[in-house]
From Swiss-Prot:
The protein, known as: Nitrogenase-stabilizing/protective protein NifW
Classification of source organism: Bacteria, Pseudomonadati, Pseudomonadota, Alphaproteobacteria, Hyphomicrobiales
Function: May protect the nitrogenase Fe-Mo protein from oxidative damage.
Family, similarity comment: Belongs to the NifW family.
Entry keyword set: Nitrogen fixation
Record GO biological process: nitrogen fixation
């Protein structure tokens, strides 16, 4: 496994949070934060990585910190999020609501009624 930060490079830390907010593509986040990545991992997990990075960033308090410290923390959160999905699948982490709600390892709840497709076909005389 290739670490995403094995080939990290120096970055421009000026007003880093505002610059990150203006980005849209996952590749842009890695470029701005100076982190290399495996395109195969990013192609499969890009949305999951960015969502997890956002969750990690939300836990941080950047108030009054210098740009260099903020940039280092932002870089660390992206590296951490990337590693989460470089070592396991998006289904393992389930960062999105739709995946959390449909976890096959969780028992079905009683508030959802399951109707087998076969019973619907029988009702219409089709089998």
């Amino acid at each position: 496994m290739r670490s995403c930060f094995a080939e990290s490079r120096a970055i421009d830390v000026t007003d880093i949070l505002a610059r990150l907010k203006s980005l849209s593509a996952a590749e842009e986040f890695f470029a701005v934060l100076g982190i290399s990545y495996d395109p195969r991992v990013l192609n499969v997990s890009r949305l999951h990585i960015l969502k997890r990075m956002g969750q990690y960033l939300a836990e941080e308090d950047f108030a009054g910190l210098p740009d260099g410290v903020i940039a280092a923390r932002a870089r660390a959160t992206l590296e951490r999020a990337y590693e989460d999905f470089a070592t396991s699948s998006p289904l393992t982490h389930r960062v999105f609501k739709v995946l959390k709600e449909h976890d096959p390892d969780k028992p079905a709840t009683r508030d959802h009624t399951f109707v087998p497709f076969e019973s619907i076909l029988r009702r219409f005389g089709t089998e």
